[in-house]
Amino acid sequence: MKEGVNLLYESVVVNLGARCNASCEHCCFSCSPTKKEALDKNEVINLVENFSNNPKIKTISFTGGEIFLNYPFLYSLLKIVNSSGKISTLISNGFWGREIETVKKYFLDMNRMGVTNLSISHDDFHSKFIKTDYIRNILIESRKYPDIQITVNIAVSKNSTGDKIIHDLGEAILGIPVTKFPLIPVGEAKNINDDEFQNIYSLSHPNQLKCPGFEPVYHFNGNVYPCCSPAIFDTALILNDELYQDFDKT
């Protein structure tokens, strides 16, 4: 494999499960409190150990569902990654920002375990379940940990712009990278009215469709997808022919 191609795949994503404490109407994975679909925990541990010992991989990312709902298990995975000298990144809805002491503990743990990026998903859809005050608490505490890059990801539609979210975060959002991205009709978002989608991407302009990630995603449904775009999950583009396939075969 050419060196340039090797560099594309220095990270891998593990989607641990569909369980979430929110039931957002735009969720690309249709996650909710009642969903039980998840990767087998022992197999996840084996996968993460395999990833951590693979010299090609530099970064292992964890997402869901909501990964902080089973914090002891998440912490055990972070320990595996950190013990191998690799780094972790996390995606969360930030529900744990409710209690200041919990926020302090989690940041101490993340800092010790080599977490370099924490992405918080919060927008008009998430805020129906997770108070924006909780996100503010996380952003304020994050200033004590400059080695952990915080970003806020805001899904938007024509009438749900996320502007009120940014306003309500106040000074806590200052200096924090914010990404606004348009909804696409996958998962639960298929049920949203068509006129809510901006449709800013077009197959007639392929230069707009460049993927910035190139991260294989080990999904809770057992498939391995070639990237993390929500659009990929409604296609036949999968990379595995067996469950819990090792990274080199992928």
Roles of regions detected by a PLM:
Residues 1-93, 97-105, 112, 117:
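Conserved alpha-helical substructure of the radical SAM core
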Residues 69-213:
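Conserved AdoMet/S-adenosylmethionine-binding subsite of the radical SAM
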Residues 16, 121-123, 228-229:
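Short loop/turn segments at strand-loop or loop-helix junctions that form parts
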Residues 182-250:
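Accessory C-terminal segments flanking Radical SAM cores
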Residues 65, 155, 229-230:
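Short, well-ordered beta-to-alpha junction loops that form the rim of enzyme active sites
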